[in-house]
Amino acid sequence: MKEYPSVTVIGAGLAGSEAAWQIASAGIKVTLFEMRPKKKSPAHHSSEFAELVCSNSFGALSSDRAAGLLQEELRTLKSIVINKADKHSVPAGGALAVDRSQFSLSITNELSSHPLITIIRDECPSLPKTQQITILATGPLTSELLAEDIKEFTGEKECHFFDAASPIITGESIDFSTAFRASRYDKGDADYVNCPMNEDSYIKFHSELIKAEQAKLKDFEKESAHFFEGCLPIEQLAKRGIDTMRYGPLKPIGLWDPRWGDVNDKNIRRLKRAHAVVQLRQEDKAGQLWNLVGFQTNLKWGEQKRIFRMIPGLSKAEFIRFGVMHRNTYLESPKLIEPTLQFINRKTLFAAGQLTGTEGYAAAIAGGWLAGTNAALLAKGLDTITLPSSTMIGALTNFVSNSQASLRVKNKKNFQPMPANFGLLPELDNRVHNKRERYKEYRDRALGQIKKLRETLLDKSSYPTTI
């Protein structure tokens, strides 16, 4: 068996775990660095790989939705992380959500038992000084020492935003004389717990929320604190206006408790419908833990307990984990990396995951898949690949490696993180006016391209045929 150069992967989050698996599956030795548990981050709670620090949801499951298409592309390309997400999924309506503990543990066990993967549980304080093939997948919580070394290597000031996580409570502490099980518009099973608010309880809740005491930021964080729009703390959302939450995570539309009466009776519907609804999503297979959907927060823990217990049905809520906020670092990638995820000024160094400025779990996995695949090809002396911009993976990669496209999409002077969305894809050859039909056409085109790519990689023998 031919001996190929080994590859180093720094960081065992979603991107790093995926990258390490793809490389090892191609028959190449991998050294995987993970600083936890020796050095902890502000947001992680365990030492397991691919830990989900915010929501336990990967987004919409249907492949005619942007997040769902990205997941389906990864399934087609034999992603180990999406495979484990599917195996450890929990009921979440039309979304892919996972039991985060079982999910992370299964990935840790899979990588730890692979004969070609050597795991080093220590901080990697600097980039390799040689031309060793390396993937930088340290994520948004990159350690200070390594972040400084990256800054020196790139010559660019790092970018950042603030992200937050939602609280988790026990299911047995929910009062179901008020709360009820349902999915919006009764689609699928009744996977969510819903806590309805009337106008009076909503106004009181809003009033307390906007004046609640927040956890203090460090001085250097205060100077440039800004939030990612897709994950605003609930208190920041509330401060935008009395009804902002009702048109966001607390929207009541499509949610009805059968105990209120006949939903088809207009008079009953007018009298009984909720003014706002707080939803809870299942955290674990057993249904013992539930997270408050959209309740990312930076409130002090005592304030979280006091104010969130004002929600009808949660007056005796038992908190297993409080919401926290943390600083997320990312690169100004369009100035630094190519569509292959190689650095422009060092072809043996790759970047992957949220560090590159993609947003969302599946997008991080996609970056890990591409960086891992290309690192394996490079180690074998083969040409690296780029993905068509008509695929969601290719579109996201194009976004983080093409400055003009990035600035045009966001219409801002500064590069900002981007989640999967159909606005990144090129127009169809034939214009389709119906939005849902257009999204299906995008899906069919993308998956057709991904299947062709898979066959190409199989021909190169640089691709896992099984998981």
From Swiss-Prot:
Q: Which gene encodes it?
A: trmFO
Enumerate the PANTHER family for this protein: GLUCOSE INHIBITED DIVISION PROTEIN A, METHYLENETETRAHYDROFOLATE--TRNA-(URACIL-5-)-METHYLTRANSFERASE TRMFO
Q: Which BP terms from GO are recorded?
A: tRNA methylation; tRNA wobble uridine modification
Q: Which domain of life is it from?
A: Bacteria
Q: Where in the cell is it found?
A: Cytoplasm
Return the protein name: Methylenetetrahydrofolate--tRNA-(uracil-5-)-methyltransferase TrmFO
Q: What lineage does UniProt assign to this protein's organism?
A: Bacteria, Bacillati, Cyanobacteriota, Cyanophyceae, Synechococcales
What organism does the UniProt record list as the source?
A: Prochlorococcus marinus (strain NATL1A)
Task: Give UniProt keywords alphabetically.
Answer: Cytoplasm, FAD, Flavoprotein, Methyltransferase, NAD, NADP, Transferase, tRNA processing
Annotated residues for binding of FAD? G11, A12, G13, L14, A15, G16
User: Which is a Pfam family this sequence falls into?
Assistant: GIDA
Q: Which NCBIfam families match?
A: gid_trmFO, PRK05335.1
What SUPFAM superfamilies does the entry give?
FAD/NAD(P)-binding domain
| InterPro entries per record | FAD/NAD-bd_sf, MnmG-rel, MnmG_N, TrmFO
Q: Where mainly found?
A: cytoplasm
Cytoplasm as UniProt keyword: yes
Catalyzed reactions per annotation? uridine(54) in tRNA + (6R)-5,10-methylene-5,6,7,8-tetrahydrofolate + NADH + H(+) = 5-methyluridine(54) in tRNA + (6S)-5,6,7,8-tetrahydrofolate + NAD(+); uridine(54) in tRNA + (6R)-5,10-methylene-5,6,7,8-tetrahydrofolate + NADPH + H(+) = 5-methyluridine(54) in tRNA + (6S)-5,6,7,8-tetrahydrofolate + NADP(+)
Identify the Gene3D superfamilies for this entry: FAD/NAD(P)-binding domain
Q: Which cofactor does it need?
A: FAD
Q: Which family does it belong to?
A: Belongs to the MnmG family. TrmFO subfamily.
Q: Which GO terms describe its molecular function?
A: flavin adenine dinucleotide binding; tRNA (uracil(54)-C5)-methyltransferase activity, 5,10-methylenetetrahydrofolate-dependent
